[in-house]
């Protein structure tokens, strides 16, 4: 029997691969393996906790240079003294807030996830974008829809 969901996931994985969005490719392939094995019983947990675990791992990656000392504390302190750094802080706050709205939208309206992924893949492949867009795109969409 034809599995449309599997076909869509394989199509998105191929599209991601050819647009050099390896993180999405790997994520989709892992989900395909989970779907096709007894591990599929972990989907309720993944659906409930996946975003939280992913954000924890992302936060660890972002904070690692501070923890390791690659970014010295003196550099962090100077961030509060220069207009460019203050602007960067303000933008960081805005983008974090936007990403939070995106997580909420993606959790409450999963029908938008496919469109956000396809838009990100097109942005990466055709416009030399960077594949960090789905959460921010969802946040912008939530502003447009008035959700969150």
UniProtKB/Swiss-Prot annotation:
Main subcellular location of this protein, as a coarse class: membrane
Coiled coil: none
InterPro entries xref list: UPF0756_TM
Membrane topology: Multi-pass membrane protein
Sorted UniProt keywords: Cell membrane, Membrane, Transmembrane, Transmembrane helix
GTP-binding among keywords: no
GO cellular component: plasma membrane
Family assignment from sequence similarity: Belongs to the UPF0756 family.
The protein's name in its UniProt record: UPF0756 membrane protein ETA_17460
Lineage summary: Bacteria, Pseudomonadati, Pseudomonadota, Gammaproteobacteria, Enterobacterales
